[in-house]
Amino acid sequence: MQKTHRPRVRLTQALFAGVIIGLMTFISACGGNAHTQKQASQNKTQLDHLLQQAKGVGVPISMLQPVLTQEQQLSHSSAPFTLFNDQPATNYYQNLATRYNQLTIQVQGIISTATQQFQTRAQYDMQNFQLALTRERTSRHFSNIGKFSQQFSQDQLLLSVAQYPKDYIAISSDALYSTNALNLIEPTYVRLNTFQHTVGQMHAASLDTTAMQAQYTADMQDYNSAVAPLDFQNLGTLLDAQYQQALVSSIQALPYIGAAKLNEFQAQVNSLKTYGMDASTYQKHLASYQAALKKASSINDYLAVAARIQADITSMHDMLLQGQANYLIKYIDQQARAWGNANHYHDKFDGKNYLLTAGYTLPGIGFWLNRELGWTFTAADFQSVIDEENNELFDLQMLEANYNDPTQYNHVHATDLQMLDHYSLQHKQVLMVSMAEQAMRIYQDGKLVASFHVTTGRVERPALPGVWTVQDRKSPDEFKSNDPVGSPFWYPPTHINYAILYHWGGFFVHDSWWRADYGPGTQFPHNDSGGDETFAGNGSHGCINMQENQAAWVYGHTDWNTIIAVY
């Protein structure tokens, strides 16, 4: 019996083995090439790793979402099923590997773009922080300014070592927080003065103001110890309440207090008109308030009118800032052109007259102020622009005063000292750049330590006047033109040995090895003795050019805390 069944068993085993081999061949044929499957899997892993890295360095999910969506779609796809032909499946995995690789490259670009965007934003926010800090230093009525100076130095240090979006986001957050607090100092100080004036009027009316004077003293202590926006907001609320209480307690002085409030409102209405804003509604309110105050005979009457006036003053605050910010840009341009045309530079090279004040005109700092206004929405943003504009007006006065100063470029200038005093820079390191002289003087703690001739921006793209902080330092670097080939402003990729960014948007203090000549007049068309008329025969594109060895000295003797003052 065993001999009879043995051939059948062998036949069955052979058939089973054949089926297994055939099935394996079939599965292999339908699954695609193993190498392409592995490559697709590896590329997906690489993409996932890079996405996690992007999230880890602070790239917002919103910027990564298109890639995440595409990856999800790829993950939910599957290889085609075909009999006895693995080429379609192989093609599928090859395409999958390619798409994952493309998405990886896209994520790398997103990381780079996000880093650049947040770096620029941090530089802009730090510039606004510095402007607000300078304004309050100049006002000299807030004794706790040192706390904000320390915070600025700390943020500046963070900016010097920042690498990732999350670093720049944190710097922007700190800068905005401090700027918001600084922007509340002036309104709070005005409220304090109003309260003090009210107490003074009550005292003049022979009223007992002992308690109110004690309140004012306590308020001043709170004011000078404030460090956060909430500190100033709470003090402002308290002052409003104290002012209302003062009105209740001062029936004899109410007519004087009401008149003072009305005068404040009148001044703001006049400012709206000056700025070209529609003040018709507020003008009507003013007339009604004047009539109401004349008729007022009780505390409640005065309180009601005062409350309405204060409501209007509050409501027009943002409108005033917006109007002033837009008005001052044109006003600066007008002032710069008026003086510049009366004191033009006559260029013997081409026989034309040029503005020495081009940096203050609309193509100069005006372009950048208008650009800032283009993304300005909050009161704090408008205030930052106004701070910068007021600085520009002062700097323009310094240029005008320095124009007729016969002092040699390598000696201390009176206008330099005024700049140091006005901006409280006596204990700082300052690169003081005179556009009228085309000279740079370096001051350390108020003392002149070095002087160099420079070349600043041409009339079409002047250097930007103002007091700036260091926003980046690079050695070496390569500059690439944003203008198309054929443009008079285009230049080929250029190696730079030493570069210090003084204003976001690509404004540097740097070496210009292609130039031979520097100093007065080199910001206008001229014959450069080095023979390069294409790139050396005119001013820069807004940068401050220096001889290479001098730029090396400046780079080596400065740091992230150095101030660049251009006037």
Model-derived segments and spans:
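Long amphipathic alpha-helical scaffold segments
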Residues: 366-431, 442
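Solvent-exposed, acidic/flexible segments
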Residues: 40, 64, 93, 115, ...
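Gly/Pro-biased beta-strand-loop elements
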Residues: 408-526
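Exported/periplasmic cell-wall-interacting domains
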Residues: 287, 291-294, 304-370, 406-407, ...
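Sec-dependent N-terminal signal peptides
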Residues: 10-22
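Sec-exported extracytoplasmic/periplasmic mature domains
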Residues: 52, 76, 157, 225, ...
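Amphipathic alpha-helical assembly segments used for oligomerization, scaffolding, or translocation
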Residues: 2-13, 30-355
